[in-house]
Amino acid sequence: MCKRIVGLLLFMVLLCMPLRAESMYRDTCYSLRTDVGYAYNIVYGHHATFNMGAMLPINRNFEGEISARATTANTYTIGLRVQPKFPIKRNDKDCGEVLLETHVLYNRFQRNHMHGLAAAFSVGYRWEYVYAKVGYGMSMMAAMVMSQHTTENSIFEPHNLVYYLEIFARPHTSSWNISACITDMTDFQMERMFTPIFILRSYVDVTEQWRLYFSGQCKPVGIANQAASFFGAEMSTGASYRF
């Protein structure tokens, strides 16, 4: 499954490479994105994913993001991310930026009559070819019906190391790119620190407003733990529009 995802993603990247070389997405701006995907794991089997998100920058140094996911496996997620940014300059030269991120997720597993909440606080650094962050996370899961809240069907994980490392083939402001990432928290899930998620991404700017992107990810373990998401492997494609 993971080999197929990687192969398809690389093929789509090769198709996009001839497009323009300079990015039109250099500045923080309001944008909307949507994508659809296919996912599979041993718990929910084959299912489709539908994601939407909105980037809501207040200014060049502070931005927020709202995201939502629904799947045909009757799982639902709402995410909120806020991120102050602090540019670093040395001798009037741009040396990247430091980011302070707060990320909150609400997950609803309708089929299992469970829901969960996860939150993470991290410090990150982003420059031309790298985006890295590390922080502290916590999560809990419980039955939806209050009368069923017992020690047996509610779990609280107060301590978790959150990490994210993404390496880009070209400067991240380029008009097309491909990247490889390892993390334990994405837009729609937070895993335990020893359950890494491997992600391969690409994007291409087709106009000043429109960006197309592709993503494939796999998680070799983690289906049985309380923080596990809805898939062991997933591939998706979508578009974003910048205002």
Regions found by a protein language model. Name each.
Residues G116-F188:
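Detector for outer-membrane/organellar transmembrane beta-barrel domains
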Residues A21-T72, R242:
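Short glycine/proline- and aromatic-enriched beta-strand/turn motifs that initiate or cap beta-hairpins
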Residues M1-S31, F243:
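Cleavable N-terminal export/targeting peptides
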Residues Y30, Y44-F50, N74-L80, G96-V98, ...:
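Residues that define the transmembrane beta-barrel architecture of outer-membrane proteins
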Residues N59-I66, I88-L100, E128-V134, M140-A142, ...:
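Repeated loop/turn-to-beta-strand initiation elements of outer-membrane beta-barrel proteins
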Residues T34-Y40, I66-A70, V82, L100-Y106, ...:
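Transmembrane beta-barrel strands of outer-membrane/channel proteins
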Residues A180-D184, Q189-F243:
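Predominantly the C-terminal beta-signal and adjacent terminal strand-loop region
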